[in-house]
Design a protein with these regions (language model features):
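Short beta-strand elements
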Residues: 2-4, 113, 217-221
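Short, structured active-site "lid" loops
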Residues: 1-14
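A short, ordered amphipathic alpha-helix with a cationic face
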Residues: 93-97, 108-112, 123-125, 138-140, ...
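Acidic carboxylate-rich catalytic motifs and surrounding loops in phosphoryl-/glycosyl-chemistry enzymes
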Residues: 97-101, 300-301
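Positively charged, Gly/Ser-enriched RNA/tRNA-binding surfaces
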Residues: 9, 17-32, 39-92, 139-302
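Short terminal or interdomain "cap/linker" segment that borders an active site or interface and mediates
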Residues: 102-136
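A conserved hydrophobic position in a structured secondary element of the catalytic/binding core
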Residues: 14, 100, 252
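Short, conserved phosphate-binding/catalytic loop or strand-edge motifs used
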Residues: 58-62, 99-107
Length: 302
């Protein structure tokens, strides 16, 4: 992050993303509004990257946040919206939405009675996919062999549905298994909705920020070496600003996504309504109806 000091010695930071500012606004300017609440934004954000990475440190961020909604239905709504954003702007359909859940790795590590430093080091090695160093690090820890096998194997489990099956075979307690089963349910529902070729899983996905609390995801487009879309659930963040509420959202790097756009086709926007009862069947039917020549827009349910 870019950090500065004001004349009183206080640390000032250029915003690295918009999620935290939105969480703060929910507890100030919007504190009297009823939930659930849907927001969108466009703003410049600033991040410091390693030198020679070829990445910009300032870019245009565009995103949505759903405040006050939790559970499978809401997670699916946001994931479908993310998929349709990528699909509408990339008619070649050479993109992937990679999905994970922070609770899979988090619940496993919390079971191992490790110190905070060891936890952070393990997560950092997994995040960097530094698997040889991870194996060496685990060898020096006094933990069960099944724990070591889980941590050494999980980073290799990325791809299609079969990776979920393999992860279930490694689960060493009910909490870990429950988190894997939830991700499986999300994957199968997206498959049922017709998105299987656009999605993959990463069973060890770890975000760079620590406020995520559940489903997380990243969008990639062929030929672009960076993530163009990212998001997830952050149920605990708003409580830091005074108002406890569940939340989920995502943002896109506008500049990167524009590079993947195909403007040859004019798209008519057609909103669809999805009721809560039998939502999956109804959503699937309406997606099929709009699949060929119309744009899918998810709007508020009654």
């Amino acid at each position: 992050m870019y950090k500065f000091f004001d004349r009183n010695g206080r640390i000032l930071v250029l915003r690295p993303d918009m999620t935290v500012p939105v969480a703060r606004m929910i507890n100030t300017k919007l504190k009297d509004m009823d939930l659930p609440l849907k927001l969108f934004y466009t703003a410049n954000v600033f991040r410091v990257h390693e030198s020679l990475e070829g990445k910009r440190n300032e870019y245009l961020d565009c995103g949505i946040e759903l405040i006050g909604g939790d559970g499978e239905i809401i997670d699916l709504e946001i994931l479908v919206t993310a998929l349709e954003v990528l699909k509408s702007l990339n008619t070649r359909e050479d993109f992937k939405l990679e999905i994970g859940d922070v609770n899979i790795l988090r619940s496993a590590i919390n079971e191992m009675n490790l110190g905070e430093e060891d936890k952070e080091n393990i997560i950092d090695l997994i995040n960097k996919k530094s698997l040889i160093n991870l194996k060496d690090y685990l060898e020096n820890l006094k933990i069960k062999d099944e724990y070591k096998e889980f941590l050494n194997t999980l980073p290799w489990l990325f791809g299609g549905y079969d990776m979920i099956e393999k992860a279930k075979g490694l689960a060493f307690n009910n909490r870990v298994k429950e988190n894997i089963l939830y991700l499986e349910k999300i994957f199968l529902n997206l498959k049922e909705l017709g998105y299987e070729k656009y999605i993959s899983v990463d069973m060890s996905m770890v975000p760079r920020v620590n406020y995520y609390s559940g489903i997380i995801f990243k969008g990639y487009v062929t030929g672009i070496g960076s993530t163009v879309l990212k998001g997830g659930r952050y149920n605990d963040l708003l409580e830091n600003f005074g108002r406890k509420s569940s939340a989920i959202g995502f943002s896109v790097d506008v500049n990167l996504l524009i590079n993947s756009c195909n403007y040859d086709e004019k798209i008519d926007r057609k909103p669809i309504l999805v009721e809560k009862d039998n939502y999956l069947i109804k959503l699937k039917e309406k997606i099929k109806k709009t699949r060929d020549d119309e744009y899918l827009e998810i709007v508020d349910r009654e």
